C-alpha cells in the first residue's frame, strides 16, 4: 500500500513538473511586445497589463506624447524600437502614415467601429476613443481677478486675459495640432494665423503634453486652458478639485480620435497584430473609464462612459472636422503657426 502510494505521489509530482515546465515554455514562446503610448499613463499601464494577462506576451511600454513618438519613429525609420502605438490624436498618426512609418493591417474587430471616420482609409490606424475640445478655467482665480470665463474662441483674445491662457505645443502634442487645424477650419487659413498671432500675447505657456493645462489649471499655475474636456473631468472626479469650470466654444469645436497602429518594421509583428485586435475589444476599451480616461468609446460593444455623461459631455455638438485637410495640409499649418508666435521659453518641450 505504501509502495503504491509512493508511486502515485511520484506520478503526480512528475505530471506537475511537466505541466509547470510546459506552461513556462508556452509563456516564453508567447514572446514580447513594446508599446509607445500617448494616452494617459494609468490607462496605458492597465491596457498593457491586461493584454499580458490574456496572452502571456511580455508587454513593456513607454509613455510619450504623440509629437515625441512621431519624432522618435522618424529617427528610427525602418527599425523601430517599439511595435505598437497606442492612444493619442490621429493628426500625428496621419503624418506618420504619409511618411510610410505605419503598417496597414485588417483587424477583425475593426468591424465594431461605429463609423468609417474612426479608421484610416488605408488601414494605417484605428480609432479607440473620441475626445471633445473645449475651455476650462480656475474659478477661484477668475473670481479673484474679477474676470468672466471665456465662452467662445474670440473671447480668449481679450486683453484682460494677458498671460493667463495655455494650450499644448503642436510640436510635441497632437492636441496642439488639433487646435491649429480646428481654427483653420473654423476661420480659414489666414484668419486662423492672425488669430494665433493675437492669442500668443495672452499665452503664458505652450505645454509639452495635451493634458498639461488641465493639470495646471486647478493648482492656479494656469488660469485658462484649452484642451480635452475629459481631462478636466478626471481632475474633478479623480483628484477632487472643485475649482474648475469648463465649456465648449459657442461657435463650434472639434474632437480628437484617439488611435492605435503598428509601426512598419515591428520586430514582434504577430504580437502587434494581436494587440490591435485587443485594442479594438471591450477587454481593452472598457479599462479606460476604470483608469481615469473618460473619452467616448467608438466600438459598438463597449460600455457607455457614465462619468462623461454625468458631466454633460454627451450634450456637446461638434463640428464636421475635415480629417483629410488636416492630413494633407497640417504640416504646413503647424509651420505657419510657429512663424506667427513668439518662439521663447513659453514653448515647452520638456
What are these model-predicted stretches?
Residues 37-45, 80-221:
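Extracytoplasmic ligand-binding site segments that recognize negatively charged/polar headgroups
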Residues 131, 195-200, 206, 229, ...:
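Periplasmic-binding protein-like
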Residues 24-95:
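Early extracytoplasmic/lumenal segment of secretory-pathway proteins
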Residues 91-95, 218, 224-243:
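A ligand-binding cleft/hinge motif common to bilobed small-molecule-binding domains
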Residues 17-20:
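C-terminal motif of bacterial Sec signal peptides marking the signal peptidase cleavage site
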Residues 258, 263-320:
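Mature extracytoplasmic/periplasmic domains
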Residues 318-350:
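Conserved C-terminal helix/tail region of periplasmic/extracytoplasmic solute-binding proteins
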